[in-house]
A protein has these predicted regions:
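Alpha-helical bundle regulatory/interaction domains
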Residues: 1-192, 202-206, 221-225, 230-241, ...
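A generic alpha-helix surface/boundary motif
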Residues: 193-194, 214
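DNA major-groove recognition helix of helix-turn-helix
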Residues: 199, 211, 249-251, 262
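Amphipathic alpha-helical "recognition" segments
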Residues: 208-213, 217-219
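Positions that flank functional sites
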Residues: 215, 250, 266
Length: 271
């Protein structure tokens, strides 16, 4: 199981975490670890005319998101994304496990880099009421409970294939020596084709894309938090044959080289 306190505190997926507005991760509600990895809850109140751009290298997964204007299922991203925040607002999101996504969409490949509006007025009202509480911490916790109660009622326990897809996610996310699809197949004791089917059905991305996303997230984190490490050192630690291959993957997904990312970091972006 990959959801834990340490993971709640890390900055993977967020390219400039210190530029975020108020942002909290909450653990998955009790009994829902197989369906929800964690909850994420940002809130912001920015000066008039000010825009805060949040740049994200998303996890290879989908999110259920409740915002003031409704509920959406945000599908798996194939590239870096951003959102421009202004004024005041909030969101309550659940990073979904593969087993949960299968019950919300039959083919998540169709919602890559897209959002699907969900007709869930009761969930929206309950979370919005929670987030309107004067005491923000109590509001977050109440919103998390409401979303958890909805998930418990709406999403069944993982199927056998869903549990296997979760195990695949756990393996890829936690073992940085995994760099090729045949390694996943061997560890799960299924065929390469079986891994491909699991990834397509339960995540909506090719398995190699899932592997590379986790490695790129880790690469970005280390480039940001360990400025004395060379790009070549990071590449070697993450199983790349050389830094050129890491740089190529980095450019393909993020649109810029690892060295450019490191140069874009100011003193306030580092721990």
């Amino acid at each position: 199981m990959i959801g834990n306190t340490v993971e709640l505190d890390d900055g993977r997926g967020i390219l400039y975490p210190r530029r975020l507005p108020t942002f909290h991760r909450e653990p998955a509600p009790t009994g829902l670890d197989d369906l929800i990895r964690w909850l994420w809850i940002p809130r912001w109140s920015l000066p008039e005319g000010f825009v805060s751009r949040q740049e994200i290298l998303p996890f290879p997964a989908s999110n259920l998101v409740v915002e003031p204007d409704g509920v959406t299922l945000a599908g798996p991203a194939t590239r870096v994304s951003h959102r421009d925040l202004s004024g005041s607002g909030w969101a309550v999101g659940a990073l979904l496990r593969p087993a949960a996504l299968a019950h919300l969409h039959s083919d998540p490949r169709l919602i890559q880099d897209d959002q699907l509006v969900l007709d869930e007025p009761d969930l929206h009202l309950a979370v919005a009421n929670a987030m309107s509480r004067a005491e923000e911490r109590a509001g977050r916790q109440c919103a998390a409970r409401e979303l958890g109660q909805w998930a418990a009622a709406r999403l069944p326990a993982p199927s056998q294939d869903g549990a296997l897809a979760n195990a695949m996610e756990d393996l890829i996310a936690s073992d940085r020596t995994i760099v090729r699809v045949p390694q996943v197949a061997e560890r799960l004791r299924i065929s390469v084709r079986g891994v491909q089917r699991l990834a397509q059905r339960f995540i909506g991305l090719a398995p190699l894309a899932v592997i590379r996303r986790y490695r790129l997230q880790e690469a970005a984190r280390r480039l940001r938090e360990e400025p004395d490490l060379t790009v070549a050192h990071v590449a070697a630690d993450l199983g790349y044959s050389d830094h050129a291959h890491l740089s190529a993957d980095f450019r393909r997904v993020l649109g810029f080289a690892p060295s450019s990312y490191r140069h874009s970091l100011g003193a306030h972006d580092r721990p």
